[in-house]
Structure formats: C-alpha cells, structure tokens
Amino acid sequence: MSNNCTQHMYLQFLDELKHRYKNAKNGRTYHFDTEIQPFLIHSKMIAKCIDDCDLDSRFTYKIKDKVMSTITELAMSAHIERFSNKLFTEMHKYISHWFFYLIERDSK
C-alpha cells in the first residue's frame, strides 16, 4: 500500500462512490464545480496512491494501470443517473478487490 493512503481512505472512497451513485440513480443532480470536480481530484489522489504501490506477481503494471483508470472512470460515472447498475457494480467490485488485496498484502 502507498505510504500516502490508508486503509480507511480506500474504504471511505468505496463508500462514497456507492453513496454518490445511489443518489444519482435517485435523481440527484450534482453541481460540477462544487461537488463533482473536488471528488474527481480526490479520486486522482487515490489513483496516485495506487500508482505508488509496489508491483508483485499478481499486481502487475497492467493491473495497476487498469485499476487507476477504473478509479477515475468510476468517480465520474457515479454522478450519472443513466450509468448502468451492472457496470457500476462490476467496476466497484474490481477496484474493491485490488484495494483489499493491497491492504492485506502490505499489512504482512
């Protein structure tokens, strides 16, 4: 795990993604300048933490790159009412898997 991010930060980010997506599905409209843009900046910080993580036999460069791009894509998509629930769930599970992998790996 990156020295700049904690387990709490990863879990909080995952929860916030779900919360924002649920609100968007319920018709909430987010203001770009005051709500979406700060969250996108935060998501880029989380992606940077992933970029700082060490590689291993499972967490390869290709996986790292995909996790980082999925984080930023999902951070934007979570604010769109018409974004597919199935796709949101798959992407959320994907980054969750790698967050938990890195947390467990680096806590040993």
Predicted regions mapped to residue ranges:
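Short acidic, glycine/proline-enriched loop segments that cap or flank alpha-helices
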Residues: G27, H31, L55-F59, R82-F83
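Short terminal alpha-helical segments
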Residues: M1-T34, H92, S96-F99
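Short, solvent-exposed, charged loop/turn and helix-capping segments
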Residues: K44-I63
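Extended amphipathic alpha-helical scaffold segments
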Residues: F13-Y21, A47, M68-A75
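Charged, low-complexity C-terminal accessory regions
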Residues: A24, F39, R105-K108
